[in-house]
Curated annotation (Swiss-Prot):
InterPro entries: Carboh/pur_kinase_PfkB_CS, DKG_kinase_firmi, Myo_inos_IolC, Myo_inos_IolC-like_sf, PfkB_Carbo_kinase, PfkB_dom, Ribokinase-like. Its EC number is 2.7.1.92. GO terms for biological process: inositol catabolic process. This is 5-dehydro-2-deoxygluconokinase. GO terms for molecular function: 5-dehydro-2-deoxygluconokinase activity; ATP binding. Pathway: Polyol metabolism; myo-inositol degradation into acetyl-CoA; acetyl-CoA from myo-inositol: step 5/7. It comes from Bacillus thuringiensis (strain Al Hakam).
Amino acid sequence: MNPLIFKEDRPLDLIAVGRLCVDLNANETQRPMEETKTFTKYVGGSPANIAIGASRLGLQTGFIGKVSDDQMGRFITGYLKDNKINTDQIHIDCTGAVTGLAFTEIKSPEDCSILMYRDNVADLNLDPTEVSEDYIKQSKALLISGTALAKSPSREAVFLALEYAHKHDVVVFFDVDYRPYTWQSEAETAVYYNLAAEKSDVIIGTREEFDMMEKLLNYEQSNDQVTAERWFSHYAKIVVIKHGGDGSIAYTRDGQSHRGGIFKTKVLKTFGAGDSYASAFIYGLMQGLEIPQAMRLGGASASIVISKHSCSDAMPTRAEISAFMETAEELV
């Protein structure tokens, strides 16, 4: 059963808020970054990737964020517009802040890493005064991403967006998106992630991300069931815990659980899997699919993206996912 109820009389399906950055993916693979000579530029950032994926699948999508007042900022905004994402609430930073950069290293399909430049980034300068209540109430759903909670004023902007969402019955998706390099300590991270999760209808994260959120609780032993049940005492209706190549498990407040598998593919790199999974899973739920069907879409989308060089450019259409699912071997 799909427990989510969306307000159907709204012009936007999904609004994402948070990180907008640039990915520079290594063109030379099977080697360390020290030996990489060229990179290809893509729009990046977890909420940006999810918004792009959702738009490719047919959802009417918008974004609340902030970009640098330079060529990189204009590149990001232009790319989102080209992908039919409403950019009315993407603000331009006037303080001299820059666009975050993510350099990727692809030594092998199993050995990929990211080198991040996140000092003085524009996306974390999003101010609460730049979060429009009128804009949020036009949407059926809001996606927040954990990285936007790392610093003020972005942190307060996200919590204000959450308040507006609850006021206007906007379904909230929380993609945990834990990036240690943006935080001062695990304790600080856990506090703000827990506060955001308490106000979310759907929480999506890896087992490791949920472990981080539980560090302050001093659990002697935790498991997926215990983790999920903790959130059902708050707003959560669905908790998805991802286990990489072992698939994912979705828990619902009525006590049910659903296991999602993966689709066999030729893996080029591992990053981008979570964002593509989230975009297709959210799309499926918003189309009224049952949770197992939405999870299959997510798994197929993830397998497509990890077989390609980019994350944002590789986000598939609904037709591409359907064609892939017809031929690829599903591993449950």
